[in-house]
Regions:
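Acidic, mature catalytic/reactive cores of soluble proteins
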Residues: 1-298
Length: 298
């Protein structure tokens, strides 16, 4: 149940660009076998972030601009890739999701199977839907890994892991032309368009900025960033703050520390009231919870 019953559906996106018969990684990933390391940073020309992250890659006369956005209030991620092929040969962009479908922090199950039916992926009792204007190409199910997570290992989390693949999305761009690849992955059957996800996120952020009333650019950026930590608690139907996201849950202490800066300073008094009501719903002996009971746990 939201927000603490988290499931990792897609671990990462393996982005590649094929030019002149050579496949070049745009994404980056360490492997236990260092010779297999994918280092797309070598081709990254720029990175910007306002309402959403945007990466720019330049490879042998081709430019790829990637944008990603989370749909507000939905379990949906939208992707837009703009490819400008100034080269003399066809460019093929390939996006391969690395799938897991397991609770956060857990490994793939032994023999875990992923079923692809049209644009629906099922595994481990869970389903993910997608839509794209590119070509969805089924692949024989295969494992990717073992990946190396050096920074996670420093925190005592697993230092290595695996993921599965069973499809990719492709878009071919002839020389001298520009094309756009769009894709949306979501847990709901009714999928928004990629452009809708971006426009809703932008509209939400403009509304937050107007409510806060700040004119300073840094202050407006903090208002946008603070809004990303507000979540809805399914057990109470009210708001809560994931102050330590993505690592921690909505701990009472951290939520109360974050509430003045994330909500009151941003002019979000009704949301602040909802957060307090969420915690007061579990008040006991004059104390509010530091952790919420989930699934029958105390």
């Amino acid at each position: 149940r939201a927000p603490n019953r988290r499931v990792q559906m897609i671990q990462r996106l393996e982005d590649t660009l094929t030019l002149n018969g050579r496949t070049i990684p745009l994404s980056s990933q360490d492997f236990e076998d260092r010779a297999r390391r994918a280092d797309g940073r070598a081709y990254q020309a720029a990175f910007t972030f306002r309402d959403y992250p945007q990466w720019t890659y330049q490879v042998q006369g081709a430019e790829v601009v990637k944008r990603a956005a989370l749909m507000p209030g939905e379990n949906a991620v939208a992707l837009i890739y703009e490819i400008n092929n100034r080269g003399r040969s066809e460019a093929v962009l390939r996006v391969t999701p690395h799938l897991r479908f397991v609770p956060k922090g857990e490994a793939l199950l032994p023999g875990q199977q992923f079923t692809l039916e049209g644009k629906r992926i099922s595994s481990n009792g869970r389903t993910l839907y997608f839509q794209t204007n590119g070509q969805a190409v089924p692949l024989p199910q295969a494992l990717r890994g073992p990946f190396q997570f050096a920074q996670d290992a420093m925190d005592g989390k697993p230092a290595a892991g695996w993921a599965a693949v069973n499809h990719c999305i492709e878009l071919s761009v002839p020389p001298g032309e520009s094309r756009t690849l769009e894709a949306v992955y979501a847990t709901a059957h009714t999928l928004p368009g990629a452009a809708e996800a971006f426009s809703r996120l932008e509209a939400q952020n403009r509304a937050l900025e107007r409510r806060a009333g700040f004119t300073d650019g840094a202050a407006r950026a903090l208002v946008r960033a603070a809004g990303q930590f507000l979540s809805r608690r399914e057990s109470t139907g009210g708001h809560t703050i994931l102050a330590g996201f993505p690592f921690f849950e909505d701990w009472g202490r951290d939520t109360m520390i974050a509430l003045p800066g994330c909500l009151l300073a941003a002019g979000r008094c009704q949301e602040a009231k909802s957060v307090l009501e969420t915690f007061l719903a579990y008040e006991q002996d004059g104390l509010v919870p530091n952790l919420f009971p989930e699934g029958g746990e105390e």
